[in-house]
From Swiss-Prot:
<dbReference type="InterPro" id="IPR018211">
    <property type="entry name" value="ADH_Fe_CS"/>
</dbReference>
<dbReference type="InterPro" id="IPR039697">
    <property type="entry name" value="Alcohol_dehydrogenase_Fe"/>
</dbReference>
<comment type="similarity">
    <text>Belongs to the iron-containing alcohol dehydrogenase family.</text>
</comment>
<dbReference type="GO" id="GO:0046872">
    <property type="term" value="F:metal ion binding"/>
</dbReference>
<dbReference type="GO" id="GO:0008743">
    <property type="term" value="F:L-threonine 3-dehydrogenase activity"/>
</dbReference>
<dbReference type="InterPro" id="IPR001670">
    <property type="entry name" value="ADH_Fe/GldA"/>
</dbReference>
<keyword id="KW-0560">Oxidoreductase</keyword>
<keyword id="KW-0520">NAD</keyword>
<dbReference type="Pfam" id="PF25137">
    <property type="entry name" value="ADH_Fe_C"/>
</dbReference>
<dbReference type="InterPro" id="IPR056798">
    <property type="entry name" value="ADH_Fe_C"/>
</dbReference>
<keyword id="KW-0408">Iron</keyword>
<protein>
    <recommendedName>
        <fullName>Probable alcohol dehydrogenase</fullName>
        <ecNumber>1.1.1.1</ecNumber>
    </recommendedName>
</protein>
<dbReference type="Pfam" id="PF00465">
    <property type="entry name" value="Fe-ADH"/>
</dbReference>
<dbReference type="GO" id="GO:0004022">
    <property type="term" value="F:alcohol dehydrogenase (NAD+) activity"/>
</dbReference>
Amino acid sequence: MAASTFFIPSVNVIGADSLTDAMNMMADYGFTRTLIVTDNMLTKLGMAGDVQKALEERNIFSVIYDGTQPNPTTENVAAGLKLLKENNCDSVISLGGGSPHDCAKGIALVAANGGDIRDYEGVDRSAKPQLPMIAINTTAGTASEMTRFCIITDEARHIKMAIVDKHVTPLLSVNDSSLMIGMPKSLTAATGMDALTHAIEAYVSIAATPITDACALKAVTMIAENLPLAVEDGSNAKAREAMAYAQFLAGMAFNNASLGYVHAMAHQLGGFYNLPHGVCNAVLLPHVQVFNSKVAAARLRDCAAAMGVNVTGKNDAEGAEACINAIRELAKKVDIPAGLRDLNVKEEDFAVLATNALKDACGFTNPIQATHEEIVAIYRAAM
């Protein structure tokens, strides 16, 4: 086995009502001026103001940038960076789900390295670490609060740029599940299926290790057991906390084993049509695994077992099929759209979507490499 490197924030605080402990840790870092990157909804809900007040009580000045869009753009990064510079901020705090986290990473990376966020598309393109960043998570989840992945939409090219860089790993991640109680059903379902995609893609990745395998399979089990409960009753504190841990485990898996064609293809849908990332992943996940089962059937059989399927007596191919069926059943149970047609994806766009998907860094670790025609066929099957 080749040597592997395991990336993770140096400190990670998880569990109900853990934000207060994390706030005290923030004060210990010695930051004096920080930029809070969030979205308009969390500002309206008062959550951003609560964080700002807690920082003020600890003698930390803060300014809020809440212009982050659901698929954060290069313009969002530039606007946040301008505010950071105007206020001489020495650190960044992200508050929200994957969008504020990714936007904050982009801001912090360019603040430290200069240039434009487009300069860092690809793998490890930066020269030095971003400004110190603390990520407060409110969804379960993208796991962006603890990864080296940063996804930014380049509106000029209609693509999502995959920035995979060890230098965008936050210093501290916070997963206070009490902040997730208010998530609506649709967001709970989409982000939960995103986490499942992280776990399964990491498990079948060519870069998987025993450590990422353990994280991935545990995440699959916890998501299969708890996502329907969290969607059915958002106030179920036990299910919310379980999902917070599950998405973090999935994050540890894919942050180090990387991903595959589900994400490579979903990024193109999000960039081209401005669609929700988690929903795109959920729709594509079973179809990509049908393609992957040609070489990863045994691994998919393991995932089926982790989802609670009895695979006794099933060979690898049968186990893989059982996994794919279980994914479809879970997606249906949490009301994920049946196909890309429901998202108004157009077949005439498949060629350009496939071309861009094959350039996405997430696809490099897929268990089998695809031709352009095969990617188009997967999109078509997902309609």
